[in-house]
Amino acid sequence: MSEKNAYAKSGVDVEAGYEVVERIKKHVARTERAGVMGVLGGFGGMFDLSKTGVKEPVLVSGTDGVGTKLMLAIKYDKHDTIGQDCVAMCVNDIIAAGAEPLYFLDYIATGKNNPVKLEEVVSGVAEGCVQAGVALIGGETAEMPGMYGEDDYDLAGFAVGVAEKSQIIDGSKVKEGDILLGLASSGIHSNGYSLVRRVFADYTGKELLPELEGKQLKDVLLEPTRIYVKAALPLIKEELVNGIGHITGGGFIENVPRMFADDLAAEIDEDKVPVLPIFKALEKYGDIKHEEMFEIFNMGVGLMLAVSPENVNRVKELLDEPVYEIGRIIKKADASVVIK
């Protein structure tokens, strides 16, 4: 018995792994950017930081996954957008620190290598990288029979960006009177899906719920997370924002206070929040308390900016999209987030 046959009998298909690598090369090539060194398949990804032109570089890193949204991708057998979610979760955190994301690495673990499915996943990763302007410089696909079911997989990512030291955004510049501007989310993004799956557990995904304006439920649930890099970078370069909040798990209540010091608070005008139809549907069909929705979901705002009043018009001018003035920074009395 050859070693290859012995390994195959244990559930690991080496040939399928090689096929995955060949299939994804064209997708990786789409993400090329200045600074990338080496070739796909090396032991380590390399990036020449001098190509960024940053004078005092500070590296900023982020890692994340997409949680149980993956279970819906598997349930509905749609795998070409979940990779974008993974990229978004990492690069949006990096941009919140005032850094430009540079490169990305992915990790896929599965019970059985399915080259077609894994190519779809990586195509989504590559699309996310293109949208974020980052290079996909490496990754790992691990076939782990016994750890995962044959149709199951997990996906995680790691991104690195660079900030000019003087432009780091850490909340220290946010002050009382700053205006809170919201940029729209594309949907649920990648958080709260354990609750989402419970609410819609008995649905096929093909339903046309009246709240969803003609879209099938599964398409709304799998709408990929928006990537904010290209919207936010010009604002950072011009030093127009004092704070940035990526609204992820924990919704407004947990993420907004991460933007500023402990002696400040955010006052949110609920009427100005562009609540998306899916959140109204979740509240209705899940019998979720209205105030709890803001503790779980982004409610239609995926990125929040704290901006000095005199810079608001310039920010709106640079952003080629609707911008929502949803609140302001106040002195903290009790709660860190006050929704009125």
Swiss-Prot record:
Give the top-rank taxon of the lineage listed in the UniProt record for this protein: Bacteria
**First-listed, main subcellular location of the protein, grouped into a coarse class:** cytoplasm
Question: Which reaction equation describes what this protein catalyses?
Answer: 2-formamido-N(1)-(5-O-phospho-beta-D-ribosyl)acetamidine + ATP = 5-amino-1-(5-phospho-beta-D-ribosyl)imidazole + ADP + phosphate + H(+)
Query: EC no.?
Result: 6.3.3.1
Q: What are this entry's molecular-function GO terms?
A: ATP binding; phosphoribosylamine-glycine ligase activity; phosphoribosylformylglycinamidine cyclo-ligase activity
Q: Give the family, as the similarity comment puts it.
A: Belongs to the AIR synthase family.
Q: What is this protein called?
A: Phosphoribosylformylglycinamidine cyclo-ligase
Species per Swiss-Prot/TrEMBL record:
Streptococcus pyogenes serotype M49 (strain NZ131)
